[in-house]
Amino acid sequence: MQIDIRKEGAVTLVEVRGRATIGAGNDTLAGKLRETIDGGAAKIVVNLEGITQIDSSGISTLVRNYVTLGKKGGALKLLKPTGRVRDVLEVTRLMSCIPTFDDEAKALASFK
């Protein structure tokens, strides 16, 4: 799994590529999100465009960090889920719980 992090004003964009499945891929994602939140990020957009597969452990990581940020007064939002990843998010109804966007500019603007 490859993860790149960049800042757009007060928003942290986490761009993820690879598989968010049980094991090393999801461990990497969970660790990077925890590190980002512990570093003070309160507004996070996770770009899922490069995720090729997600399972229950990947879903758990997204939900756990969404809840963690919410408790701290922040927010986690999702960006560009595609294909099977979008299907999983729709079936689990996660897209109705966590704000999800197909356009980066709209995701960023949603924090204002």
Please identify what each model-predicted range represents:
Residues 1-15:
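Short beta-strand/loop segment at the start of cytosolic alpha/beta domains
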Residues 12, 20, 105:
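Residue-level detector of flexible, active-site-proximal loop/helix-junction positions
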Residues 20-98:
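Amphipathic alpha-helical interaction surfaces in cytosolic regulatory modules
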Residues 83, 105-106:
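Acidic phosphotransfer microenvironment of two-component signaling modules
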Residues 99-103:
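Short acidic-hydrophobic, aromatic-tinged amphipathic segments that line or gate anion-handling sites
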Residues 107-112:
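Short, charged, intrinsically disordered terminal tails
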